[in-house]
Amino acid sequence: MLTRLFSEPGLLSDVPKFASWGDGDDDEPRSDKGDAPPQPPPAPGSGAPGPARAAKPVSLRGGEEIPEPTLAEVKEEGELGGEEEEEEEEEEGLDEAEGERPKKRGPKKRKMTKARLERSKLRRQKANARERNRMHDLNAALDNLRKVVPCYSKTQKLSKIETLRLAKNYIWALSEILRSGKRPDLVSYVQTLCKGLSQPTTNLVAGCLQLNSRNFLTEQGADGAGRFHGSGGPFAMHPYPYPCSRLAGAQCQAAGGLGGGAAHALRTHGYCAAYETLYAAAGGGGASPDYNSSEYEGPLSPPLCLNGNFSLKQDSSPDHEKSYHYSMHYSALPGSRPTGHGLVFGSSAVRGGVHSENLLSYDMHLHHDRGPMYEELNAFFHN
């Protein structure tokens, strides 16, 4: 809309006079409805705006009248001011929202006070102490279990899982003995003990029970090679892929080349009386003997190859350079038998490559020297 300045002298005559402008001028009559009397139209030559520009007067509450252009100007100014205020309020609200918003998503982390830090530290210390005591109790229980199971070694220690497996097999073997009511064969007993165990643990159990671990391997080949046939049966010779450390290469090849169905007519004699004495002295339950001899405290040497049969042997000290067998050593004690028969499996025979045809069985050598004690102990497993 076009606006005009009221300073022009031609427009001052057109401005209506209001009752409130005068100092108590109440000469103008008022209607009951508050409408002012109609004003006469302006003179055409007075320079006033024409009919197109003339606006109807707007009556107010007190009978005041203002022209329409003035009212439109007031409305425009009010709308512009309201929009500016709304924009300012929106900007302030955004600033406040950005200031209150946390930097990271998720629940707001509680502020750690000194009391909360002390409580958290105390809880952590108690949890660590409980876990430490639990592990100490578990290790102590496993150590006690290792003393009970039939496996003993001063240099090696069974792992936790192997200890539990051996204890389970030991309990199963004892329950089978109670169920059958018979004394088991040593080989079947060791087979039950070593079921599911690793090869190092199997060798350790066999060494404690003074047996060759090859005689009770639980997994047999399809052709039956390396199978133990029991008392009175032949050994099926099994070729070994690694060479013998104590014999010459030709002798090991001769011992290993007998596989593939060829078997020696070697009778499986009974176990040595010294082995059975150690086993029976513990009550027949398979408890491990306590070795006090310094001969068995050294590390294990490579397996000893004798006609295809491998057995573990301790590294002997310079005092034990004779390298005679454990059973021959204890069987040669006074009161057992003459020492001449105890050198059948001696070091000279081993180094000389004695074949199985030249070796006499244990029963043939010592039958006339056996006393009642040997007969009774041997009958413990072969009744």
UniProtKB/Swiss-Prot annotation:
Region Disordered, residue ranges: 1-130
Summary of the knockout phenotype: Mice exhibit small brains, ataxia, reduced seizure threshold, growth failure, and postnatal premature death. Show excessive apoptosis in central nervous system. Lacks nuclei of the lateral and basolateral amygdala. Organization of cortical neurons into barrel structures is disrupted; thalamocortical axon terminals fail to segregate in the somatosensory cortex.
bHLH domain location: 122-174
Disulphide bridges, residue numbers: none
Biased composition (Acidic residues): 79-98
GO BP, sorted A to Z: associative learning; behavioral fear response; cellular response to calcium ion; cellular response to electrical stimulus; cerebellar cortex development; negative regulation of synapse maturation; neuron development; positive regulation of calcium-mediated signaling
UniProt subcellular location: Nucleus
Superkingdom to which the source organism belongs: Eukaryota
One Gene Ontology CC term in the entry: nucleus
Key word DNA-binding present: yes
Matches recorded under Gene3D superfamilies: Helix-loop-helix DNA-binding domain
Chief place where the protein resides: nucleus
Residue stretches of biased makeup (Low complexity): 45-57
GO molecular function terms listed in the Swiss-Prot or TrEMBL record: DNA binding; DNA-binding transcription activator activity, RNA polymerase II-specific; DNA-binding transcription factor activity; E-box binding; protein heterodimerization activity; RNA polymerase II transcription regulatory region sequence-specific DNA binding
Nuclear localization signal, short sequence motif: residues: 108-114
InterPro entries: bHLH_dom, bHLH_transcription_factors, HLH_DNA-bd_sf, NeuroD_DUF, TF_bHLH_NeuroD
Transcription found in the keyword field: yes
Compositional bias per record (Basic residues), positions renumbered to this chain: 102-114
Organs and tissues of expression: Expressed in the external germinal layer (EGL) and internal granular layer (IGL) of the cerebellum (at protein level). Expressed in layers V and VI of the neocortex at postnatal day 1. Expressed in all layers of the neocortex at postnatal day 4. Strongly expressed in layer IV of the neocortex, particularly in the barrel cortex at postnatal day 7. Expressed in the CA1, CA2 and CA3 and dentate gyrus of the hippocampus and many nuclei such as the habenular thalamic nuclei, paraventricular hypothalamic nuclei, amygdala nuclei, and pyramidal nucleus.
Functional description taken from the UniProt entry: Transcriptional regulator implicated in neuronal determination. Mediates calcium-dependent transcription activation by binding to E box-containing promoter. Critical factor essential for the repression of the genetic program for neuronal differentiation; prevents the formation of synaptic vesicle clustering at active zone to the presynaptic membrane in postmitotic neurons. Induces transcription of ZEB1, which in turn represses neuronal differentiation by down-regulating REST expression.
Record note on domains: The C-terminal region is necessary for depolarization-induced and calcium-dependent transcription activation.
Protein name per UniProt: Neurogenic differentiation factor 2
UniProt gene name: Neurod2
